Amino acid sequence: MSFSADEAAHRAASDAEQIAWVDEQDNLLGAIGRAELRERGLIGRGTYILVFNSAGDLCVHRRTLSKAIYPGYWDVAAGGMVQADESYAESAARELEEELGVRDVALHAHERFFFDQPGNRLWCAVFSAVWDGPLTLQPQEVLEARFIPVAEVMRETEHKSYCPDSLAALKRYLASL
């Protein structure tokens, strides 16, 4: 897999980042490097921010090929791993600004759930926001982004690769409406 030196450096820094390590009940156990957490099959915390525009369309974005998990997949949520020293809400605000350039927007907290797949074991916190402003994409993590109707997103999941963890977050959000 080929990616830029900038993406490679970003990936190395991301793998070394100290993130929250938790147990099956979401109790904080300590801090651990992201790559080590994955390698050892431990559980972390993740945030999933569903960004809608005022027309109700959902922002989907394509992940870069340098991502450790689901490279090149489409994603229905901004978000990422919760750092060791931050809350779910702090992580959501940070990730939303980093990935899409969205800041100073009301984040609405929804449910938390446990996602368990080999190499991706997370307590997930779902948030939503409404944003009609411009998007500023983080080139080391996001290749492209667009707003599309939720029904179209669900159709696309039948023939395009979408991240299963963020899809689980979206489905739980939709079921709660």
Where are the regions a protein language model picked out?
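A glycine-rich, hydrophobic loop/mini-helix early in the fold
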Residues: 46-78
